[in-house]
Curated annotation (Swiss-Prot):
GO cellular component: endoplasmic reticulum membrane; lipid droplet
Cross-referenced PANTHER family: 3 BETA-HYDROXYSTEROID DEHYDROGENASE TYPE 7, NAD DEPENDENT EPIMERASE/DEHYDRATASE
Protein name: 3 beta-hydroxysteroid dehydrogenase type 7
Subcellular localization: Endoplasmic reticulum membrane
Entry keyword annotation includes Membrane: yes
Keywords: Disease variant, Endoplasmic reticulum, Intrahepatic cholestasis, Lipid metabolism, Membrane, NAD, Oxidoreductase, Steroidogenesis, Transmembrane, Transmembrane helix
Main location: endoplasmic reticulum
Disulfides per UniProt: none
GO annotation terms (biological process): B cell chemotaxis; bile acid biosynthetic process; steroid biosynthetic process
Disease affiliated with this protein: Congenital bile acid synthesis defect 1: A primary defect in bile synthesis leading to progressive liver disease. Clinical features include neonatal jaundice, severe intrahepatic cholestasis, cirrhosis.
Domain of life of the native organism: Eukaryota
EC identifiers of the protein: 1.1.1.-, 1.1.1.181
Length: 369
């Protein structure tokens, strides 16, 4: 921030601060943002772990609220210097309706932007997603791409559609005059597949393996690579972006950045086994054990069952047409834009990230070997 802000302690607001990424952003701010005076944590469901944070030198204010309620968002934003908007509904399994996904991800983001404009908060960092870009509905690979790589971003699934629209709203808002007449400065960060402590989907895969007797069966060719990024490094990138957004407003304002680190490019299944293997699971098959057409059929069948059962019961299997398409499409990024624009370097090495994640899976599932 500018010199005028250096003398004062700053007020940060993290929306979705009790979510998977949000909790890591909150803890990272407390550890590594020396100018922090007050940290507001806004979420619909407040975690009990927040209480332990209230004994430190920084004032931690827990605010229970809903991003779809404009008045609640405006009250939380008022007086904040910086907003890190991580709140969002990540649902690729059909647990929520398309309407709910849109309300949270799009209307919620619109509410945050309007709250910044109305209250005079000038700096907004938005958590976007790689799925704003792809994989697209045509299954086109994105191989070692960067923020400027041409790619036909065509989506039908409610989640990537909602994130794409929300990101557009954030970038379009850059430069809008806020209360007091100064411009709003925004940027968006696009994590690839996030892993690490608190990753619910990793836990779901572990439980699925247990139900199958400790085995997981290869469904996707090992040659289909995915870029993954450790949650601690994603949180660190958010902290750095928020810190530098004022001094580098001309450079960073209205920009998007892929989140990246030293995690290796591997297939989704092979990457997961880096953590699930030490927890006792085994991946069967050097090649997929089922033909792809059969997976397509099973995914379509799951989608049909989900539609038929929706009035009666929630049926949200891991395999559906969208998750199959994503898992079966190469999507890797290779960029240094965040380093060039605001000095980002990964805080955690691959070895450290891997160890931390393994220990979490073992502790969370009681599977320590």
């Amino acid at each position: 921030m500018a010199d005028s802000a250096q003398a004062q302690k700053l007020v940060y607001l993290v929306t979705g601060g009790c979510g998977f990424l949000g909790e890591h952003v909150v803890r990272m701010l407390l550890q590594r943002e020396p100018r922090l005076g007050e940290l507001r944590v806004f979420d619909q469901h407040l975690g009990p772990w927040l209480e332990e944070l209230k004994t430190g030198p920084v004032r931690v204010t827990a605010i229970q609220g809903d991003v779809t309620q404009a008045h609640e968002v405006a009250a939380a934003v008022a007086g904040a210097h910086v907003v890190i908007h991580t709140a969002g509904l990540v649902d690729v399994f059909g647990r929520a309706s398309p309407k709910t996904i849109h309300e949270v991800n799009v209307q919620g983001t619109r509410n945050v932007i309007e709250a910044c404009v109305q209250t005079g908060t000038r700096f907004l960092v938005y958590t976007s997603s790689m799925e704003v870009v792809g994989p697209n509905t045509k299954g086109h690979p994105f191989y070692r791409g960067n923020e400027d790589t041409p790619y036909e971003a065509v989506h039908r699934h409610p989640y990537p559609c909602s994130k794409a629209l929300a990101e557009w709203l954030v970038l379009e808002a850059n430069g809008r005059k806020v209360r007091g007449g100064l411009p709003l400065v925004t940027c968006a960060l696009r994590p690839t597949g996030i892993y690490g402590e608190g990753h619910q989907i990793m836990r779901d895969f572990y439980r699925q393996g247990l139900r199958l007797g400790g085995w997981l069966f290869r469904a996707i060719p090992a040659s289909v690579e995915h870029g993954r990024v450790y949650v601690g490094n994603v949180a660190w990138m958010h902290v750095l972006a928020a810190r530098e957004l004022e001094q580098r407003a001309t450079l960073m304002g209205g920009q998007v950045y892929f989140c990246y680190d030293g995690s290796p490019y591997r297939s989704y299944e092979d990457f997961n086994m880096e953590f699930l293997g030490p927890c006792g699971l085994r991946l069967v098959g050097a090649r997929p054990l089922l033909p792809y057409w059969l997976l397509v059929f099973l995914a379509a069948l799951n989608a049909l069952l989900q539609w038929l059962l929706r009035p009666l019961v929630l049926y949200a299997p891991l395999l559906n047409p969208y998750t199959l398409a994503v898992a079966n499409t190469t999507f890797t990024v290779s960029t240094d834009k965040a380093q060039r624009h605001f000095g980002y370097e990964p805080l955690f090495s691959w070895e450290d990230s891997r160890t931390r994640t393994i220990l979490w899976v073992q502790a969370a599932t009681g599977s320590a070997q």
